[in-house]
Amino acid sequence: KQFTVKDSMLQDNGKVYITLGGVESAYYLYVNGVEVGYSEDSYDPHTFDITDLLHAKGEKNTLAVKVFKFCDGTWLEDQDMIYDGGIFRDVYLTSTPAVHVQDYDLNYDLNEDYTAADMKLSLNTVNDAVTDAADMAAKVALYDAQGNEVAKTNAVLGTIAAGKAGEKEISMTVTDPKLWDADHPNLYTMVVSLYDQKTGLHYE
């Protein structure tokens, strides 16, 4: 498979990743003739950093996947199932700026009468640049199903050292939360943005 990468994905000091959503049952991944990695476990997605293997903007890149129908985990994985093989879920690219959110964990506690929810967001950030990212902060906003902002907060992250990761605990409260149940499947959308407090430059 050949593909090109959009200019917007090739940001300064950013990263480009490829994710394979599901491949049964094991495979080697190659980009432009270079082995990227090996993976097993058919039903879990796997993500690989391919930034340094990509050609210049506009040039075609070649993706190859060498799939094995059986591996040392097949016996456990395919009990009482039809043995199959191949790519059966989406394959897609994602990109991140130099400073970005790597992972997060969100938990909440409701008060006794369910009229408020105290939210705890554990935010993991990474700086892939060669210089420190100083004066960083995070803006967190929560939206209901109609797109209305129901809660927001800002948190100071400070300096994220070059090539290092950071972690921050952020708290916010949602009043009169619309709870989820089978008859009323209410959902919220959370948006997290990282920005430089001095320049206002947004990274994500």
Language-model features, listed with the residues they occupy:
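N-terminal carbohydrate-binding accessory modules
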Residues: 104-105, 191-204
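Accessory beta-strand-rich segments of carbohydrate-active enzymes
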Residues: 1-103, 128, 145
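Exposed aromatic-hydrophobic patches
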Residues: 45-53, 165-175
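Beta-sandwich strand segments
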Residues: 72-82, 150-152, 198-204
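Beta-strand-rich binding/interaction modules
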Residues: 31, 115-159, 166-170
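Extracellular recognition modules
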Residues: 64-66, 189-193
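Short glycine/proline/serine/threonine-rich loop/turn segments at secondary-structure transition edges
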Residues: 9-14, 54-60, 131-133, 174-189
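Short beta-strand segments of immunoglobulin-like
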Residues: 105-112
